[in-house]
Amino acid sequence: SLDGSNRLKLVMLDEYDRIRIYEPTLKRFIDLDILGGSEELLWKSDDHYGGSNNAFLRITYAGQPMSDWAIDDNPDKVSYVKLRVLTYDMNKNGKNDVIIVKNLSAVGRIMRNLTLYTSSEIYDFEWDGIGLSENWKTKKIQGYVADYQIKDIDNDGEDEVVLSLVVSFSGSLRKKSILAAYDLTVPERVQ
């Protein structure tokens, strides 16, 4: 629960990588994205988060044997896999914070199907009843976060955020994948 009650909220990234928060519903997602918004939509971010290089091409199947299936390379037929959105009770107050990655692109988000993520940031947000408020964010991390999870990877009884990073070397097409872990400690608030 984002607010400490037992009322659940649906937190997701939309097709433009904006965070959306909904009241639980049995409606299909396509029915929630209507002109003017739906009554279930509680909040939508102005900024983009997530960002993924993980994609698949849709395959055309017209009742043909598998050997005759065609890969449709039309850019509109590319589906990007959204990064997960994690919730975690950072300060043990019974309220889950939203922890999300923002992959930063060297070319911005001008072209929808052109992604060149070179760095990233991790954000921690808290639900204040009307929207998400930023608690903290990391400094810029060199590399693209392909996935992330919260786990106690060093068995010290404290959870860490574990990143699967893809790091590019400048002036080269070579890439290296690494796992990085950050302690999840609540920063002291400056008064």
Predicted stretch roles:
Residues S1-Q191:
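Beta-propeller-forming repeat regions
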